[in-house]
Amino acid sequence: VTLAGKGGEEVSASTSTFEVSFNTPIRTSLSKNYPNPFNPSTTIDYELSNAGMVSLVIYDLKGAVVKTLVQEHQEPNYHHVVWNGLNNSGQSVASGRYLLKMNAPGYTETITMTLLK
């Protein structure tokens, strides 16, 4: 860029540009499910800042797997999944508290969800 100074002399200035994207989260995170308590379904929102293998698995309080919601490679983005209160066999689960564990590259988080019938 060439500019004119006070006396009309040429003054050089450099410019730089940068791009800001609001489409990619800056951090990986798992939000609380909503509604909570829920019946018959609940929504889980999560954000990925990096691509990689992601798993969201629901466990009962004894540690047994109830439902695998996500088990796949995903791109950085804002994601959500709905759990309808069914287990991996398609059967309705009992009322009670359940643990949702999310694993993603460099990130692990567990939240508690309550199903009321």
Predicted regions and their residues:
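Short, compositionally biased serine/threonine- and acidic-rich segments at solvent-exposed termini, linkers
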Residues: V1-P25
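Short beta-strand edge segments in extracellular beta-sheet folds
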Residues: T2-A4, E19-S21, E72, T112-K117
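Beta-strand-rich extracellular modules
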Residues: T2-K6, L86, N103-P105
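Generic structural signal for well-ordered beta-strand positions
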Residues: V11, V66-K67, V93
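Glycine-centered coil/turn sites that cap beta-strands in beta-rich domains
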Residues: E19-Y34, F38-D60, T68-E72, H80-W83, ...
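C-terminal tail/sorting-segment detector
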Residues: H73, Q91-K117
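Signal that preferentially marks extracellular ectodomain short beta-strand elements
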Residues: V81-V93
